[in-house]
Amino acid sequence: MPKRSVVSLEKASVASSDKALVVSSDQAPVLSPDKALISEATPAWLKLKELTGARIALGRTGVSLPTKDILEFRMAHARARDAVHTALEIEPLFKALVGKGFAPVTVTSQAIDRHTFLLRPDLGRRLSVASAQTLTTLSHDTSGPLPSLAFVIADGLSAQAIQGHALQLLEALRVELPQVQEAAVVIATQARVALGDEIGEILGAELVVVLIGERPGLSAPDSMSAYLTWHPKVGRTDVERNCISNIRLEGLGYAESAQKLAWLIRQAKVLGKSGVDLKEESES
């Protein structure tokens, strides 16, 4: 190739590079933190946000969430973990129930500790040998007819929910259904829903209601559920239960929950069944 051709190519290359690097100031992108990187929720989203504790309308900073929302998410996650691992404070709950005229009994499942309870759900569904014997003795020693209704106050996956809502719901339910005062009340630890079946069977209860702490969510670490089962016995399945969930101040309030539960209890006795055969149609 002739020398002059090489020089011409080099000049053309340099000229092309210089042209590519030259950008006028009025063409350069402007990255303003106040305008380009930060975005807040619109008024419409903010109005929806007032109606729920769910994480909506968080806004953004660049491609991420604002620092405030990230920290709140981590705090919610920590609260949920604490709710799962925190033990139920039995003594204050026991005394509070006695103070309201109930006669509670305490039992535990076959899960010997929280670690076992979380890893072995099956053990949380059966009573320990000692607890089964305690209830058997109690059912034999009781003078007069056995209670037709039994309440099991179970820690489940959120002792915090039980600590905060169980007694309040029972008080509200007593207004709707005065015979609640005569019901058997059992406090159960390391307990799953199905533990109520064995408890109800041993006590000879017609109906068992299990008040249990729900699995914590990131916006609700203290949510409680009420499970109702007609003629409880070991082996009952979820299809034979009725459930009222999200019982808490920010969810379904005590009065409304009590109205629904009282309706279900009455209808279960009328129909002689619970679960999918009993549809909740109360007007509350």
Describe the predicted segments one by one.
Residues 2, 34-130:
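Active-site loop/lid in soluble adenylation, ligation, and acyl-transfer enzymes
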Residues 5-9, 13-17, 21-25, 29-33:
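Ser/Thr/Pro-rich low-complexity tandem-repeat tracts
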Residues 80-95, 100-103, 165, 172-185, ...:
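Alpha/propeptide regions of enzymes that mature by internal proteolysis
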Residues 107, 188, 244:
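Hydrophobic residues at beta-strand termini and immediately following loops
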Residues 107-108, 152-154, 209-215, 229:
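Short beta-strand segments
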Residues 112-114, 159, 217, 235:
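Short, acidic Gly/Pro/Ser/Thr-rich loop/turn segments
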Residues 120, 125-139, 146-152, 156-208, ...:
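Conserved mixed alpha/beta catalytic, RNA-binding, or beta-rich assembly cores of soluble enzyme
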Residues 214-284:
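C-terminal functional extensions of proteins
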